[in-house]
Design a protein with these regions (language model features):
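Extracellular ligand-binding/catalytic regions of CAZymes and related secreted enzymes
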Residues: 25-27, 34, 45, 49-57, ...
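Short, solvent-exposed loop/turn segments at secondary-structure junctions
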Residues: 37-38, 90, 118-120, 187-190, ...
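A glycine-rich, often tryptophan-bearing local segment used as a flexible ligand/cofactor-contacting loop or short
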Residues: 91-161
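Catalytic beta-strand/loop cores that center a nucleophilic Ser/Cys/Thr
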Residues: 25, 133, 138-214
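Helical hinge/lid and interdomain linker segments adjacent to catalytic or ligand-binding clefts
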Residues: 32, 39-120
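N-terminal export signals
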Residues: 5-23
């Protein structure tokens, strides 16, 4: 099945439309920022293409993909409803740009982090407060079972109780478990916990969560290394739901 066929499938059977009460709202612009100061993921071009198509199919948002740091000014950010990071490393943002991003989210806009967004800004404590945790290795790159931690949450209710995916699996350190609502977590029985690189923590292996930063809605998915994950209709629907939630088109 081609990428376009995957996208057509999800648009026809599982894409979510905005709430009727907000149907006349103009398209929300979402800044998809893919600057890689560290490892650069091969999947970035595919991810941008799929997100762009999801926005078109949904009819609620428009994706603007960029690596231009100039977008992070108060004036430029004002053109967007949300910012989405698929980034790595210590991005060379100025203190003014960092403050602009924090104020943007605090004031009620959305922030979404994908995969290596937690492998970003280790030396900026406010970023940890924003996203909720840091990447701490990926002991597994395989087919795993993923538990739906809150099957009643609208972002993941369509998944049932669990799903299987083949992807690079992150473990998270410094996780703000009290301030985060975990939506998906690794089923520990589906992996080898005896590997030397495994760090067992009391909160396990959260893979998808949502949280708030000031008045802003924050979403993070550790999934998304593999192109096959991006082409999966379930992942596409999850991201569509997350964008609609972060931009306040859904509760």
């Amino acid at each position: 099945m081609t990428r376009r066929e995957f996208i057509t499938l999800v648009s026809s059977v599982s894409a979510i439309r905005p709430l009727d009460a907000r149907a006349e709202r103009p398209l929300d612009r979402v800044l998809y920022f893919t600057y890689s100061a560290g490892y650069r993921h091969d999947v970035l071009p595919l991810s941008a293409a799929i997100l762009t198509q999801l926005g078109r199919d949904c009819g609620a948002f428009e994706i603007i993909a960029t690596e231009d740091l100039a977008e992070f000014s108060t004036g430029n950010l004002g053109r967007y409803a949300a910012v989405m990071f698929y980034t790595t490393g210590e991005i060379p943002m100025s203190s003014v740009q960092k403050t602009a991003l924090l104020n943007f989210v605090r004031s009620g806009h959305g922030f979404l982090g994908i995969h290596s967004a937690t492998d970003t800004f280790y030396t900026w404590p406010d970023y940890l407060d924003l996203i909720g945790g840091y990447f701490n290795g990926h002991p597994w790159h395989q087919a795993v079972t993923i538990e739906v931690a809150d099957a009643a949450d609208p972002l993941v209710a369509f998944l049932g109780s669990s799903l299987q995916l083949n992807d690079e699996v992150y473990q998270i350190s410094d996780f703000d478990y009290r301030g985060s609502h975990v939506l998906l977590r690794l089923d520990q029985s589906s992996v080898d916990l005896s590997k030397d690189s495994v760090h067992q923590r009391f909160y396990g292996w959260p893979l998808v969560w949502k949280r708030f930063f000031g008045e802003g809605r924050v979403f993070y998915s550790a999934l998304g290394h593999e192109g096959s994950v991006w082409q999966d209709p379930r992942y596409q629907r999850l991201l569509t739901n997350a964008i609609l939630w972060s931009t306040r088109r859904s509760a």
